[in-house]
């Protein structure tokens, strides 16, 4: 009570703050001149809507999620991660609700390289490490550290070692190596040249890598 609101920001202040908050950069000279030179009513609302609809907003938010989800261009040091990256960016582009975004990640299944199925990269990222993956999931989405419960009951929480393994059992059946390429259907599409050039290139690189390991 008795507190007064801050005075209205100047156009210069608003412009800078809007760009930094929404797209993660300061405005260019041209953008600054265009905004400050406009006398249109509601130009601030128009600016915000334009920035929210821009690819810059997608890339700025992606930087946050890429860090949180530990995204890599090569998952588990051998699988191409571009499909996973594209899925995250498209989810942000569509302004996908948070609960839907998380649900699609934790319930992802199917071949990693299948078009539109990039959410499976969430599991491929920690291929062969189901316990570490579960600890990371809890840290990201529950905001709590449970990794110590892999070996013993949590010393500062009620979580037991048994409960940790019950959590981990949720993804026990996930096989990151099985049917990575989507089986016969995807290989046939590759043969019939129905896949984008960049996807075929990634598949070829993966096949070459496997061949080298076999030799």
Residue ranges and their predicted role:
Residues 1-208, 212-215:
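Short, structured secondary-structure elements
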């Amino acid at each position: 009570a008795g507190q007064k609101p801050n005075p209205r920001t100047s156009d210069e202040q608003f412009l800078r703050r809007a760009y930094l908050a929404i797209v993660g950069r300061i405005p260019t000279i041209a953008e600054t001149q265009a905004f400050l030179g406009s006398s249109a009513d509601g130009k601030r609302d128009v600016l915000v809507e334009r920035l929210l609809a821009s690819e810059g907003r997608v890339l700025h938010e992606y930087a946050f999620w890429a860090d949180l989800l530990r995204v890599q261009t090569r998952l588990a040091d051998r699988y191409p991660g571009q499909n996973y990256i594209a899925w995250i960016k498209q989810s942000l582009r569509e302004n996908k609700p948070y609960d839907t975004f998380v649900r699609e990640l934790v319930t992802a299944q199917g071949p990693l390289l299948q078009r539109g199925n990039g959410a499976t990269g969430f599991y491929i990222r920690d291929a062969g490490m189901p316990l570490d993956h579960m600890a990371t999931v809890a840290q990201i989405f529950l905001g709590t550290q449970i990794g110590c419960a892999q070996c013993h009951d949590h010393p500062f929480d009620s979580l037991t070692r048994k409960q940790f393994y019950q959590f981990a059992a949720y993804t026990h059946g996930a096989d990151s190596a099985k049917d990575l390429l989507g089986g016969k259907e995807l290989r046939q599409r590759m043969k019939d040249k129905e896949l984008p050039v960049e996807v075929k290139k990634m598949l070829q690189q993966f096949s070459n890598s496997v061949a080298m390991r076999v030799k």
